[in-house]
UniProtKB/Swiss-Prot annotation:
Pfam families: EptA_B_N (PF08019), Sulfatase (PF00884). GO terms for cellular component: plasma membrane. This is Kdo(2)-lipid A phosphoethanolamine 7''-transferase. It catalyses: alpha-Kdo-(2->4)-alpha-Kdo-(2->6)-lipid A (E. coli) + a 1,2-diacyl-sn-glycero-3-phosphoethanolamine = 7-O-[2-aminoethoxy(hydroxy)phosphoryl]-alpha-Kdo-(2->4)-alpha-Kdo-(2->6)-lipid A + a 1,2-diacyl-sn-glycerol; alpha-Kdo-(2->4)-alpha-Kdo-(2->6)-lipid IVA (E. coli) + a 1,2-diacyl-sn-glycero-3-phosphoethanolamine = 7-O-[2-aminoethoxy(hydroxy)phosphoryl]-alpha-Kdo-(2->4)-alpha-Kdo-(2->6)-lipid IVA (E. coli) + a 1,2-diacyl-sn-glycerol. It is found in: Cell inner membrane. Catalyzes the addition of a phosphoethanolamine (pEtN) moiety to the outer 3-deoxy-D-manno-octulosonic acid (Kdo) residue of a Kdo(2)-lipid A. Phosphatidylethanolamines with one unsaturated acyl group function as pEtN donors and the reaction releases diacylglycerol. It is a multi-pass membrane protein.
Amino acid sequence: MRYIKSITQQKLSFLLAIYIGLFMNGAVFYRRFGSYAHDFTVWKGISAVVELAATVLVTFFLLRLLSLFGRRSWRILASLVVLFSAGASYYMTFLNVVIGYGIIASVMTTDIDLSKEVVGLNFILWLIAVSALPLILIWNNRCRYTLLRQLRTPGQRIRSLAVVVLAGIMVWAPIRLLDIQQKKVERATGVDLPSYGGVVANSYLPSNWLSALGLYAWARVDESSDNNSLLNPAKKFTYQAPQNVDDTYVVFIIGETTRWDHMGIFGYERNTTPKLAQEKNLAAFRGYSCDTATKLSLRCMFVRQGGAEDNPQRTLKEQNIFAVLKQLGFSSDLYAMQSEMWFYSNTMADNIAYREQIGAEPRNRGKPVDDMLLVDEMQQSLGRNPDGKHLIILHTKGSHFNYTQRYPRSFAQWKPECIGVDSGCTKAQMINSYDNSVTYVDHFISSVIDQVRDKKAIVFYAADHGESINEREHLHGTPRELAPPEQFRVPMMVWMSDKYLENPANAQAFAQLKKEADMKVPRRHVELYDTIMGCLGYTSPDGGINENNNWCHIPQAKEAAAN
């Protein structure tokens, strides 16, 4: 006991770091490295050593930084780190849970009864047993020489600060080197993998729950700020729900860089959409995006017309359709192969999982960052919400460059392909790879539809922008005033299940959609808000839905008046 009292705060931090970093992460180490014995390589061995060291050093780095608040505050904060990590380790060990935004959001719910349902006697016993030793160390130690004390003491400043900085560098540098090595493998194989550092951060204590907690806090602050600054259509307008919406599933697929003039269903010479061509309940439109870059389009494509400024940065003025549906009683989950966190938080989704977090799931470890991973997440979401009135948002990588990385080898139908970023591909090679990626988009959308084919469901798809693929111009993101037309060409689709069409009003709305699609009526991003509301059957007596933008609007009354 005397030794415990006498050791410095720095030594105690290191002992705690070993306990939290190694012992509490034991189950994760076993799952991540258990298969290495059967398929061992030097790089796998190096990554195992790096991750073991990183979990210890990042915890040490954190505990030393917390000592900047002084002895008393450090004891409290360090105790919280131990307790939170011990609690998280229970679910990671016995339930194989990946601690991410969704878990933190669930823990932070105001519905205490629901939170208590996942806390049993075994959890309490584990929490006590695992946290007892480190808590005894923390509260029986004198906490001599905190970082705050050392920085105030001449002769100790440089050395104490250097130790902390060195710990941070020893975490960052090896992980960065392994990330670079992984990128080389990606370029050589054409396989897209999640960020190595991101997966590590989302896999281990305490960085997983700390990053998720930070994301949750940022989302709450951002949401609160937006609630105060953005116009809320759900409060400004009256939305009247149809009688049969409570058992409905809504899925919105946000496409990436896919062009309608490279899709077979729109008359393209190559059959890039064989599966969608077989969907009888699909209405597909030649669409035009509101901008030419993902971040900009996400600002303007899901708000009411005029809900984003017409300035270069597309300043938001109103809340988006997903936030409105949330306020109208829909539960919602968002799964993304991208990382536009500002947009994801603005949807007010109950659960958000982005690419690194999805890649850290045990079932996905070692797999490419493939849009099909979102289908697995969607299955989980549907299973958790068996009663309907549920929204699922899927943000894909679609046909984003490098096109060849967007699809597995089995979809390499057109060759030669464009391999690598710096390979100086010809236009024909780029088009071959791009068209292969479109075929995989077709496969993905069809797979999503399969998940809700037997449910009362409606599925929307819209790509965020188009792409230039020619000798003069490549990619996208050209300022919209100067952008060529192909950067605005996006497919937009609506699919309704047979059960959804059993309702006469929905069947009538779909007939209108098919009529407009057959007439090749062009559609725009700015019509999505009103279309989603209208196709779900919502009405607004005070202007909350612009019927001119509602694709499902039946213009009978207008035609009668004209006659």
